[in-house]
């Protein structure tokens, strides 16, 4: 049995057509089903529907053989027990700092609100900047507006939400896309099967990119 961990939303929507190229199609619509384990048209392949931030954990611990996770999630939660063989070039966005439009650069210790705590610590450590990290799980844009933080670090797609709240994107930390990740033990035990899937997905990505 080959188990693939996916999260609902943009990543799932963009991944399903790629899996279909490999003949892997869910037997019911994951967006409408309440099931978290979904069979596919291949009897020995199933999908696990999990939170985006949990995909690396499921794969690393062998609960799933493969998964699809955003690079932002992999940067934050680590991927030491994973192979990352393929950039699927889907769900593309940017991980950036942002602050109030026109606000002067704060002097001294910086207050940064984000859910990407580990990324923020590494980023500012590399700059030699002292920061206080404030962990939030949502509505990041609010933090600078009410003086909870000087800046935020968040995923930016169009930037419309930032602008609607009087903020502007500032420093680019990383360009983000979703990656195929593979459990190391699974890669050894089911090497031919998984490598064939990787190759098929790579061809699908390249074909789509050329198109």
Curated annotation (Swiss-Prot):
Pathway annotation: Amino-acid biosynthesis; L-histidine biosynthesis; L-histidine from 5-phospho-alpha-D-ribose 1-diphosphate: step 1/9
Q: Which reaction does it catalyse?
A: 1-(5-phospho-beta-D-ribosyl)-ATP + diphosphate = 5-phospho-alpha-D-ribose 1-diphosphate + ATP
Keyword annotations for this protein, in alphabetical order, are:
Amino-acid biosynthesis, ATP-binding, Cytoplasm, Glycosyltransferase, Histidine biosynthesis, Nucleotide-binding, Transferase
The UniProt GO MF terms for this protein read: ATP binding; ATP phosphoribosyltransferase activity
Q: Which Gene3D superfamilies match?
A: Periplasmic binding protein-like II
CDD domains tied to this protein: PBP2_HisGs
PROSITE patterns found in the cross-reference section: ATP_P_PHORIBOSYLTR
The family assignment reads: Belongs to the ATP phosphoribosyltransferase family. Short subfamily.
Task: Please state what the annotation says regarding this protein's domains.
Answer: Lacks the C-terminal regulatory region which is replaced by HisZ.
Whom does it interact with, and what assembly results? Heteromultimer composed of HisG and HisZ subunits.
The name this protein carries in UniProt is: ATP phosphoribosyltransferase
> What is the taxonomic lineage of the source species?
Bacteria, Pseudomonadati, Pseudomonadota, Gammaproteobacteria, Pseudomonadales
Give the encoding gene's name: hisG
């Amino acid at each position: 049995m080959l188990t693939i961990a996916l999260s609902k939303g943009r990543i799932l929507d963009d991944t399903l057509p790629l899996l279909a190229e490999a003949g892997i199609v869910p037997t019911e619509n994951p967006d409408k089903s309440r099931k978290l384990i979904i069979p596919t048209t291949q009897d020995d392949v199933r999908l696990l529907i999990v939170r985006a931030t949990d995909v690396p954990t499921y794969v690393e611990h062998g609960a799933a053989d493969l998964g699809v996770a955003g690079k932002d999630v992999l940067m934050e939660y680590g991927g030491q027990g994973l192979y990352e063989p393929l950039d699927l070039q889907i769900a593309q966005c940017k991980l950036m700092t942002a602050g109030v439009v026109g606000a002067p650069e704060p002097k001294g210790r910086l207050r940064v609100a984000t859910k990407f705590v580990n990324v923020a610590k590494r980023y500012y450590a590399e700059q030699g900047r002292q920061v206080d990290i404030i962990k939030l799980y949502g509505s990041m844009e609010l933090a600078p507006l009410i003086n909870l933080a000087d800046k935020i670090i968040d995923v930016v797609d169009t930037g419309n939400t930032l602008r609607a709240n009087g903020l502007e994107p500032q420093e680019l930390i990383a360009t983000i896309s979703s990656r195929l990740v593979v459990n190391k033990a699974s890669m050894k035990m089911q090497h031919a099967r998984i490598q064939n899937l990787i190759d098929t997905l790579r061809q699908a990505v390249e074909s789509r990119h050329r198109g």
